[in-house]
Amino acid sequence: MEKIVLLLAIVSLVKSDQICIGYHANNSTEQVDTIMEKNVTVTHAQDILEKTHNGKLCDLDGVKPLILRDCSVAGWLLGNPMCDEFINVPEWSYIVEKANPANDLCYPGDFNDYEELKHLLSRINHFEKIQIIPKSSWSNHEASSGVSSACPYNGKSSFFRNVVWLIKKDNAYPTIKRSYNNTNQEDLLILWGIHHPNDAAEQTKLYQNPTTYISVGTSTLNQRLVPKIATRSKVNGQSGRMEFFWTILKPNDAINFESNGNFIAPEYAYKIVKKGDSAIMKSELEYGNCNTKCQTPMGAINSSMPFHNIHPLTIGECPKYVKSNRLVLATGLRNTPQRERRRKKRGLFGAIAGFIEGGWQGMVDGWYGYHHSNEQGSGYAADKESTQKAIDGVTNKVNSIINKMNTQFEAVGREFNNLERRIENLNKKMEDGFLDVWTYNAELLVLMENERTLDFHDSNVKNLYDKVRLQLRDNAKELGNGCFEFYHKCDNECMESVKNGTYDYPQYSEEARLNREEISGVKLESMGTYQILSIYSTVASSLALAIMVAGLSLWMCSNGSLQCRIC
């Protein structure tokens, strides 16, 4: 009879109504890293490292770049005859120069403070070329004879378009005294130069005067140049050299020139009509007839991600460059789908928050929720409130990270002349150091946020579990795997009240108490039976052992192996 009662109790327990708290799982193979773990599979993740580009030069926010093709910046500004297509250029967003442009200084020489001029151009978006000293105004000097085979045009000798190489006229080179007053409202970029002949014979042949000078003065500039006559190797067929200079002439300031030879005078100047963020980018790419917000020498980036690893030099509203190969933010939960064999052994699921072992692929409309089973059937239901709060929290966090990082950030290269190599090396080391710091910060940020996100989901599941536990109290039994077994019948309406937090504990407490006492009684009676069996088994085992010992002793005494004395 006791066995029948025990069996009925067990059957009753198996058929008891249950409700379980669980979380979503899917077929995702996305993996993230955290502070504590690597390659954690999650249900949802968001890549925040841009690794692709289009391989083209594009307009930046609708403004075309100035692509100099085979011309250098110096060739463009001075007016190399092979750069005539750039005589007048519209507004540009950035300037593109090849690493080794063919059309540079056609007449060999040097451009003074060239790197500083390029740096200035990185803050300019538009020039307007204006004539300041007409070529026709040099009546006492030859203004058209200053040409060279080093600067050919249509098979003939020519010269830079924007400056004038002044030669003697009628065996005389009268001293030049010229001024230009900047009456414009904008700054002016003015260029001039000096010719360094190969020998004294060339000096007098071109300028008549054996000893010459050039003086240039503004409110901030005081310069005096003298030609350096020396025998040199030929470059572009020329043993002579030219050296070019530049200055920015402010409004209402005047520039004064004085020279008695070797003077390369300005004819045109550049009015700086628009300043803004620009850059000179070294690239061999072609124009792609496209638009972007971020340009690199490798191609354009169209991305809302906060980081990229394409190229450290950028122009526009760009993600920050890092040296990382992978930055993935966890937005979902740990993805550990429940296995069928575990379901048979441990119930419906098993431990995201320390006590649930696997997620539910059957629950597709939320991150956290319930699985119930009763006489009316079973099913999954997401907890919409906790899921929505979690989605909002994770979304806000991801957006916050992107907004903080995805600000306008320009990293343009700095050029240094040959005398500044140590500064250039130091600059590169500093930039590499900054990139290392950015990379470390980005990777650490992702690891920490992923850890927090997964802990956040764990906490939400635990909170949902506690919400149910506090409602049910002793009306149900905790099974230790995220499930509760009711001590009373719980139909679908009852299950729904548990899910929405309106469960009426007093309504079911009496039924639960009676069932709880009945189950406890069955356990006690079963325990009494097991205790009797235990005592009987112990006594029987001891008696059998005593008989075996006595028999062994008698056998040993009979064959002399053991001496027996009875006192």
Swiss-Prot record:
Disulfide bonds join 20-483, 58-290, 71-83, 106-151, 294-318, 490-494. Glycans are attached at residues 26-27, 39, 181, 302, 500. The keyword Membrane applies. InterPro entries: Capsid_hemagglutn (IPR008980), Hemagglutn_HA1_a/b_dom_sf (IPR013828), Hemagglutn_influenz_A (IPR000149), Hemagglutn_influenz_A/B (IPR001364). It comes from the Viruses. A lipid is attached at residues 557, 564, 567 (S-palmitoyl cysteine). Keywords: Clathrin- and caveolin-independent endocytosis of virus by host, Clathrin-mediated endocytosis of virus by host, Disulfide bond, Fusion of virus membrane with host endosomal membrane, Fusion of virus membrane with host membrane, Glycoprotein, Hemagglutinin, Host cell membrane, Host membrane, Host-virus interaction, Lipoprotein, Membrane, Palmitate, Signal, Transmembrane, Transmembrane helix, Viral attachment to host cell, Viral envelope protein, Viral penetration into host cytoplasm, Virion, Virus endocytosis by host, Virus entry into host cell. GO terms for cellular component: host cell plasma membrane; membrane; viral envelope; virion membrane. GO terms for biological process: clathrin-dependent endocytosis of virus by host cell; fusion of virus membrane with host endosome membrane; fusion of virus membrane with host plasma membrane; virion attachment to host cell. Residues 1-16 form the signal peptide. The chain crosses the membrane at residues 532-552. Residues 17-531 are extracellular. One of its GO terms (molecular function) is host cell surface receptor binding. Palmitoylated. Its main location: virion. The keyword Electron transport does not apply. It is a single-pass type I membrane protein. Pfam families: Hemagglutinin. Residues 553-567 are cytoplasmic. Belongs to the influenza viruses hemagglutinin family. HAMAP family: INFV_HEMA (MF_04072). Binds to sialic acid-containing receptors on the cell surface, bringing about the attachment of the virus particle to the cell. This attachment induces virion internalization either through clathrin-dependent endocytosis or through clathrin- and caveolin-independent pathway. Plays a major role in the determination of host range restriction and virulence. Class I viral fusion protein. Responsible for penetration of the virus into the cell cytoplasm by mediating the fusion of the membrane of the endocytosed virus particle with the endosomal membrane. Homotrimer of disulfide-linked HA1-HA2. This is Hemagglutinin. It comes from Influenza A virus (strain A/Silky Chicken/Hong Kong/YU100/2002 H5N1 genotype X3).
